[in-house]
Structures are given as C-alpha cells and as structure tokens.
Amino acid sequence: HVIVATGSNARALPDAAFDEERVLSNDGALRIGAVPKTLGVIGSGVIGLEMGSVWRRLGAEVTVLEAMPGFLAAVDEGVAKEALKAFTKQGLRFEFGVKISDVKVGKKGVAVSYANAKGEAVKLDVERLIVSIGRVPNTVGLNVDPVGLQLDERGAIVVDADCKTN
C-alpha cells in the first residue's frame, strides 16, 4: 500500500492571482507586517472567518463577501445563527449572495467589484484582500498515468468508499 499525501494550495480567483502583498492566501494573511486599515475577505468558510476575526481584533475594518445566500450553510442552522451574531458583534461586516465581477490591484489597495444579493453593482475598496474560497490538491505534475491513477475534475485522486484507488 502507498499513501499519496501531496497537500493542497489555496484556490485563487480566476482573474486575481495571489501576490501575497495585496491579494492574499491564508498563508499570506498570516505574514502581513502591519494591521491594514481595511481588509476584505472573499469566502466565509472556517479559514476566511478565522483570518477576518484575527485581523478585526487587531483593529482592521473587515468586510466578508460570500457567494452563498446564507452563513455557514453546512453547519446546524442554530449554530450558524449564533456564530454570525458573535462575528457581527466583533465588528465583522458581511454581505451574502454576492457575485464577484472584477478585482483590480493598485498601489494603495484592491478594488473589488461585485453584484450584491439584490443584483446591484457595488465596489469595495480595501488595503488588502484575503481570498479564502477553498483548497486545490497538489497533483499537477504527479505523473499518475504510468501507475493508473485517475484524477477527478478538481485534480484530486479518485478513490472508492474505502479510500482505495482503482
């Protein structure tokens, strides 16, 4: 038996690569040298919420943009409701049901253009932007063909219910 444990990388937005200066992955978000005045977070999963909460407690004004219409959809509704209250009380600002249309990086910050849940065009200007929209497997260049491994559409190794490959 062989275990393939190649890890993962943060998923980037299609038109906004991580520069780890203005547009940050969760790794880059831990390396910010000073507290930004304003911070945007795209994605309200566990990592995005953790990063937003940390930087809010340090003094940044934090806005979290989430594509899903609700908060923590995979969690019990009561727990999600209480968590949203707690994060809001900390001072995090949330917008749900957004559709990001453009991210422009400038010398002084990042401009995020999006449609809100009502379909209205909105622009958010922040010093830094954390993109926390999931992870992608590190399987590029793994050379799976000679050993017969299959990758799914996301690049993960295909396994059965017992975590065995083909």
Which role fits each region the language model picked out?
Residues 1-22, 38:
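Glycine/serine-rich phosphate-binding loop and adjoining beta1-alpha1 elements at the start
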Residues 2, 54-55, 129:
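Hydrophobic/aromatic ligand-binding patch that stacks against planar heteroaromatic rings
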Residues 4-5, 41, 131-132:
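Redox-cofactor binding/interface segments in oxidoreductases and associated redox assembly factors
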Residues 6, 25-27, 96-98, 114, ...:
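Short loop/edge segments at beta-strand edges and connector loops
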Residues 12-14, 49-50, 55, 139-141, ...:
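Glycine/Thr-rich phosphate-binding loops of Rossmann-like dinucleotide-binding domains
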Residues 19-37, 123-124, 128-166:
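FAD-site-proximal beta/loop scaffold in flavoenzymes
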Residues 30-31, 36-40, 46-121:
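Rossmann-like dinucleotide-binding cores of NAD(P)H-dependent redox enzymes
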